[in-house]
């Protein structure tokens, strides 16, 4: 337990908890609404904002947040048009973001930037500014879902029913897309662009093995996500491997154990 004496590890633990709250809440909506592919597109589109930030000399996380939100709105708008399929709209922003990110990164003045931190992440490098960002996002998400859980659940399961109940579906969908983009960007320092989509889906998949209740999946996802981060952190420390990859590995291991355990229980019963 000597690790707990180090400030960087304390930051990593607190960041894991806050990120688990944010990912557990918005990830449940993503999985229920079947927006995993869209979220993957937004994740990779954020690379364009990172490249733009490096080129302009501003915070890459700030520029990635703006770029991701605009990309999310763009995907949502294009997918509503009759002349373009949703998967095609996602592909446009996915590839555009990656292309712009690479171009701007190499056009940045001075030495070529190290992009691995943004591609693969390192939770041990998060600082107080990152913690404040995660904390504010987790607080806003918690409040938003607490106040509007009923319309969110209605939209997630049946948009047409939600419309029949006079719920402003389009407004909620744009707001939720914004939250998806901001959550992805807020956690880039943890697992990076390549692996971020996993934190939005694996804890929810594991929770879904035990319950179909939207609210219960949120709570279980937060706990499972935090457990995955803790296990990944200790694997990273003892095996000297990247923390982002080890977090995802341990999260998938939890899912596999739960899946096998549930199957064994079914056979015995």
Regions found by a protein language model. Give the residues of each.
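Hydrophobic alpha-helical transmembrane segments
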Residues: 13-18, 61-66, 91-92, 131-136, ...
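Alpha-helical transmembrane segments in multi-pass membrane proteins
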Residues: 15-24, 45, 49, 53, ...
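Helix-loop-helix "hairpin" substructures at the membrane interface of multi-pass membrane proteins
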Residues: 131-202
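Transmembrane alpha-helical segments in multi-pass inner-membrane proteins
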Residues: 190, 194-245
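Cytosolic-side transmembrane-helix boundaries in multi-pass membrane proteins
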Residues: 241-248, 252-269
């Amino acid at each position: 337990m000597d690790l707990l004496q180090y400030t960087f590890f304390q930051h990593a633990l607190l960041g894991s908890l806050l990120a688990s709250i944010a990912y557990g809440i918005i990830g449940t909506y993503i999985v229920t609404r079947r927006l995993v592919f869209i979220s993957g597109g937004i994740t990779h589109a954020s690379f364009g904002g990172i490249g733009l930030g490096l080129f302009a000399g501003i915070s890459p996380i700030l520029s990635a947040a703006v770029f991701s939100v605009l990309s999310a709105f763009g995907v949502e708008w294009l997918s509503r048009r009759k002349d373009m399929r949703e998967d095609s709209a996602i592909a446009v922003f996915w590839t555009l973001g990656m292309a712009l990110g690479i171009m701007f990164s190499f056009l940045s003045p001075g030495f070529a930037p190290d992009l691995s931190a943004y591609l693969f992440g390192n939770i041990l490098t998060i600082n107080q500014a990152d913690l404040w960002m995660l904390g504010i996002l987790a607080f806003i998400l918690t409040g938003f879902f607490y106040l509007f859980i009923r319309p969110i659940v209605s939209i997630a399961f049946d948009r047409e029913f939600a419309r029949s109940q006079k719920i402003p579906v389009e407004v909620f969908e744009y707001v939720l897309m914004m939250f998806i983009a901001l959550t992805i960007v807020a956690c880039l320092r943890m697992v990076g662009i390549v692996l971020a989509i996993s934190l939005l889906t694996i804890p929810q998949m594991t929770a879904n093995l035990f319950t179909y209740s939207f609210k219960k999946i949120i709570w279980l996802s937060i706990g499972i996500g935090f457990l995955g981060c803790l296990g990944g952190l200790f694997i990273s420390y003892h095996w000297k491997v990247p923390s982002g990859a080890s977090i995802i590995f341990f999260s998938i291991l939890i899912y596999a154990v739960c899946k096998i355990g549930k199957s064994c229980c079914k056979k015995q019963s």
